[in-house]
């Protein structure tokens, strides 16, 4: 963006040096015009869009000669003003802020913008302007017809401006409906220079710069906020009232599922020489301290009103949105300018609230970039401010009437908000400035603060988070003392945040007044931050909470004067307390986290200080948690926070130890506070928790004003620690259901040890009592079974014979012996391996016996062994039937006549046989004479083979074939079914039987 802006400025300087250079720009303008027309035709035309387009055509009625001469003069004046820009900060430099890299579409005229986008050496600027026109087209709009209705007028407007290259007739303020579907109305800004005789240039064309955030480095540059200079003759009061008139808040529509379409339009005007108390009655203006600016000696009596308008747009795809506060970015850039001009060496760093750490791909930002008219020969003249203010108010009211009827209540609420938010900002910034200068040793700031401070007050450290606020902000500000309602909504406990009590918040459409019924009569000053749910990682959430912990200064033993000490700050005007304060933002939370800090601050008077400038401790008064209920993801927030709390606890505890202990006179270490919190307090807190629980939230603490703040903090912490692991939803564990088996993927690839199912079944037994206590009292939806149900479950568990794991009986199929097919197959493989070892030993034993039989004649031992083998075959059918249901695929793949499965089955038979001699021999089952079994078949002759085959049942005719084929003992053992069927023409049935008998001989 910076290089693009430099290219634009350089190309403009080069092309506008002569008056005749506007001719090639016009030739190239037609190309851009054709592109814009194509973009227009891409949208579906509607009658409303045609009428809007026709109106803009009628409003442009300057002749071509006047336009070309005006364009040439304007190019010359722009080049001159750029050459005149120097470190001596003049009003010309502030009028043409194109030298500022942080402001992309700067305060330039429409002719300047068009010439920049159409110069020969800047083709990228054309792309930039097209992106301004088209917006984020990758995300589908919520309402296509509205998107076309608001985009087409804007396209037509820019087309006409391209044709004219100048403008002297007023253009109506425009709306762009983003393709994401939110209507954003941005009010007009003051033109930088005005000729007294020309009234038509008072109205500015509002072109909303719509850009995609492509990198986090572009975050500060996304603000289209511009800087205007008021000549020394202007009065500060009028500029302040003008800024307050600019503070018209903007409501926006979102018809998506998120239910919260809120934005924050913040405008601040400040004068360089006005006192801090010179606020307008509307409170919309800011003193210069509110913007974090040092008064510039080079400015003289000039005053600089500034206005940054950030319109936040909720995305339909549950993306987080950045709150853009242009006044802060503008303050930063203006401070850098003034530092160059003054040379004072003071490093003034404004609060930049527009940095986005990780912008979403479809995240868009709407910023107002107003192209002011630079008049020829009258660059620095008096502005007609009252006229401009009236024009602005009328245009803004027209915007509200035409496009925001259904959001009138939100507009009034935000009008109230934008006024009070600046009061709170000024007060907080003043205190942060004081603490940074006067107590640098006690501060643990996350970012530098502006150093300008009055030396009257001293404030203990407070932290201000300068990260991007990736949440939609709905401020609800009322000057009143704070009540202390606690909340134990299902969020991870933040150990260093011990004193801020928290309370549940209703959804944003309920309004600011509908808080909990048990609260104190004066309501809070909460800024409700409602974030849309987005599947974020646990690391992002841990990072957000670590930043939150860093942003919350804690004093462990907060005295009981929190309620009474807060009223003087929240209700006091800024003129009595501080010139300005900067808003303390909540840190960048993960998209799934919803945090709502109270905008006011609670003050505790230390050490009996009763002077006019008391020593106060700035602490966040309350933090609100609201669980966002999106369709389809009702209750996953609590589980994620619970899962992340263990990771955050270590990081947060280290941050807590770094915080200064002298924040309050009764500060104690976290360990002491933990030891002091007793079981009685815990029980009392549990009773308070469950007394008044809303059903829409999981667990929400209701107010318990009688308990002091340290007790409340420790109670919420103990409640977070004592909550049992809720295993209902496991977002980090992928669960598969394959063929009836529930497979859960864990973090560890292959757990070694006892069964994970057994561990998970034992966990609820161990935590059964606290689970029952908490969940039964709260009546939350996430209940855990009682120990009796767990015992019943365990009674239904079966033990696998192979792996030894306990699993539910539903997982055991067939014979109920193995928990899965894998165990059944592995069991068979292991049994066959063991049987091979046994058979090898048995063969050696048989060889020895056979040698003895040859020498001494037949003995009983060898025949007993053979009978034992045969007896094992009797049980083969039972073994196979029990194994068949578990391992049918394994058995079907193997032939029953091959030696492999027979050896396996023989192994099963031998394993199942307790004593081989107990059962009588049944050789007739197999039809083999024991005489043949007692000898070695490999040494048989042809006649012995013939006798063997003839002894088999039904094979007397076939025996002759064996004799004719001269098959001896060795050939017999090598026979297969194919040999018998092909060579001897034996049918399949007898061939299979003969091969089965041969296999029995092989095994013996």
Swiss-Prot record:
PROSITE patterns with a match to the protein in the record: SAM_DOMAIN, ZF_FCS
Covalent link (Glycyl lysine isopeptide (Lys-Gly) (interchain with G-Cter in SUMO2)) residue numbers: 763
Ranges of biased composition (kind: Gly residues): 279-303
Skewed-composition ranges (Polar residues): 212-228, 319-329, 344-355
Any one GO BP annotation for this protein: cellular response to leukemia inhibitory factor
Keywords assigned: Developmental protein, Disease variant, DNA-binding, Isopeptide bond, Metal-binding, Nucleus, Phosphoprotein, Primary microcephaly, Ubl conjugation, Zinc, Zinc-finger
Cell compartments where the protein resides: Nucleus
Region of interest called Disordered, as start-end residue ranges on this chain: 1-24, 212-241, 261-355, 432-512, 556-589, 636-672, 848-928
PANTHER family named among the record's database cross-references: POLYCOMB GROUP PROTEIN (PTHR12247), POLYHOMEOTIC-LIKE PROTEIN 1 (PTHR12247:SF20)
Record: disease: Microcephaly 11, primary, autosomal recessive: A form of microcephaly, a disease defined as a head circumference more than 3 standard deviations below the age-related mean. Brain weight is markedly reduced and the cerebral cortex is disproportionately small.
Name the record gives this protein: Polyhomeotic-like protein 1
One function term, GO molecular function aspect: zinc ion binding
Cross-referenced SMART domains: SAM
């Amino acid at each position: 963006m910076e290089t693009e802006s430099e290219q634009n400025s350089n190309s403009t300087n080069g092309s506008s040096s002569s008056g005749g250079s506007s001719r090639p720009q016009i030739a190239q303008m037609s190309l851009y015009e054709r592109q814009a027309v194509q973009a227009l035709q891409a949208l579906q035309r509607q009658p409303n869009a045609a009428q809007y387009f026709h109106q803009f055509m009628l409003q442009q009625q300057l002749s071509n000669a006047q336009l070309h001469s005006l364009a040439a003069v304007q190019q010359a004046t722009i080049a001159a003003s750029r050459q005149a820009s120097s470190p001596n900060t003049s009003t010309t430099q502030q009028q043409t802020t194109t030298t500022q890299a942080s402001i992309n579409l700067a305060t330039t005229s429409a002719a300047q913008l068009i010439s920049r986008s159409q110069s020969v050496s800047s083709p990228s600027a054309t792309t930039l302007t097209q992106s301004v026109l088209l917006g984020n087209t990758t995300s589908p709009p919520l309402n296509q017809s509205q998107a076309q209705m608001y985009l087409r007028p804007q396209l037509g407007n820019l087309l006409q401006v391209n044709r004219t290259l100048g403008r002297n007739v007023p253009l109506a303020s425009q709306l762009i409906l983003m393709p994401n579907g939110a209507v954003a109305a941005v009010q007009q800004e003051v033109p930088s220079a005005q000729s007294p005789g020309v009234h038509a240039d008072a109205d500015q064309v509002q072109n909303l710069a719509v850009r995609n955030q492509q990198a986090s480095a572009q975050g500060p540059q996304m603000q289209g906020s511009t800087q205007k200079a008021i000549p020394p003759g202007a009065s500060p009061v009028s500029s302040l009232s003008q800024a307050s008139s600019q503070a018209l808040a903007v409501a926006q529509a979102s018809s998506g599922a998120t239910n919260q379409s809120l934005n924050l339009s913040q405008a601040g005007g400040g004068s360089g020489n006005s006192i801090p108390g010179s606020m307008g009655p509307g409170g919309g203006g800011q003193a210069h301290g509110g913007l974090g600016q040092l008064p510039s000696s080079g400015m003289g009596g000039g005053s600089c009103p500034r206005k940054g308008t950030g319109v936040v747009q909720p995305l339909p795809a549950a993306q987080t949105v950045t709150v853009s506060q242009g006044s802060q970015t503008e303050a930063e850039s203006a401070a850098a300018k003034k530092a160059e001009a003054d040379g004072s060496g003071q490093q003034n760093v404004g609060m930049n609230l527009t940095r986005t750490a990780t912008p979403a791909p479809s995240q868009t930002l709407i910023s107002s970039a107003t192209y002011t008219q630079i008049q020829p020969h009258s660059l620095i003249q008096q502005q007609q401010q009252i006229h401009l203010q009236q024009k602005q108010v009328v245009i803004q009211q027209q915007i509200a009437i035409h496009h925001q009827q259904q959001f009138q209540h939100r507009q009034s609420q935000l009008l109230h908000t934008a006024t009070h938010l600046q009061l709170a900002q000024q007060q907080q910034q003043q205190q942060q400035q004081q603490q940074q200068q006067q107590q640098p040793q006690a501060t643990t700031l996350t970012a530098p603060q502006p150093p300008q401070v009055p030396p009257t007050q001293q404030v203990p450290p407070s932290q201000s988070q300068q990260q991007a606020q990736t949440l939609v902000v709905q401020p609800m500000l009322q000057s009143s003392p704070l009540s202390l309602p606690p909340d134990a909504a299902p969020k991870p406990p933040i150990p260093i945040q011990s004193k801020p009590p928290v309370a549940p918040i209703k959804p944003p459409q309920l309004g600011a007044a509908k808080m909990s019924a048990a609260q104190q009569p004066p309501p809070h000053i909460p800024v409700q931050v409602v974030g849309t749910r987005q599947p974020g990682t646990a690391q992002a959430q841990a990072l957000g909470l670590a930043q939150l912990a860093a942003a919350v200064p804690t004093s462990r033993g907060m005295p009981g004067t929190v309620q009474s000490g807060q009223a003087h700050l929240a209700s006091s005007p800024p003129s009595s307390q501080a010139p300005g304060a900067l808003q303390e933002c909540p840190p960048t939370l993960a998209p799934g986290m919803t945090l709502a800090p109270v905008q006011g601050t609670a003050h505790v008077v230390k050490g009996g200080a009763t002077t006019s400038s008391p020593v106060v401790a700035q602490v966040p008064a309350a933090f609100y948690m609201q669980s966002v209920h999106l369709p389809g993801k009702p209750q996953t927030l609590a589980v994620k926070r619970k899962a992340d709390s263990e990771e955050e606890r270590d990081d947060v505890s280290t941050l807590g130890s770094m915080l200064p202990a002298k924040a309050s006179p009764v500060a104690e270490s976290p360990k002491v506070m933990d030891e002091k919190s007793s079981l009685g307090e815990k029980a009392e807190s549990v009773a308070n928790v469950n007394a008044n629980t809303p059903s829409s939230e999981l667990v929400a603490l209701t107010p318990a004003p009688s308990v002091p703040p340290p007790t409340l903090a420790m109670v919420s912490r103990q409640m977070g620690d004592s909550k049992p692991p809720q295993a209902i939803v496991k977002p980090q564990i992928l669960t598969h259901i394959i063929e009836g088996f529930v497979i859960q993927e864990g973090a560890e690839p292959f757990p070694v040890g006892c069964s994970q199912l057994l561990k998970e079944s034992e966990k609820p037994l161990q935590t059964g009592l606290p689970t029952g206590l908490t969940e039964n009292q709260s009546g939350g939806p996430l209940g855990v079974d009682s120990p009796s149900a767990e015992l019943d479950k365990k009674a239904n568990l079966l033990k696998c014979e192979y792996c030894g794991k306990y699993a539910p009986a539903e997982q055991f199929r067939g014979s109920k012996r193995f928990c899965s097919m894998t165990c059944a197959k592995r069991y068979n493989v292991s049994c066959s391996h063991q049987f091979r070892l046994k058979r090898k030993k048995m063969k050696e034993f048989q060889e020895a016996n056979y040698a003895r039989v040859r020498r001494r004649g037949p003995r009983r031992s060898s025949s007993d062994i053979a009978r034992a083998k045969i007896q094992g075959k009797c049980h083969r059918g039972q073994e196979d039937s029990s194994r068949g249901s578990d391992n049918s695929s394994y058995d079907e793949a193997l032939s029953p006549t091959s030696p492999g499965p027979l050896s396996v089955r023989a192994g099963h038979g031998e394993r199942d046989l307790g004593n081989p001699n107990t059962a009588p021999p049944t050789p007739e089952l197999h039809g083999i004479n024991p005489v043949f079994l007692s000898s070695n078949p490999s040494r048989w002759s042809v006649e012995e083979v013939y006798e063997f085959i003839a002894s088999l049942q039904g094979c007397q005719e076939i025996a002759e074939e064996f004799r004719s084929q001269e098959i001896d003992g060795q050939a017999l053992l090598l026979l297969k079914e194919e040999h018998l069927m092909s060579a001897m023409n034996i049918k399949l049935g007898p061939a299979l039987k003969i091969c089965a008998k041969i296999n029995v001989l092989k095994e013996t």
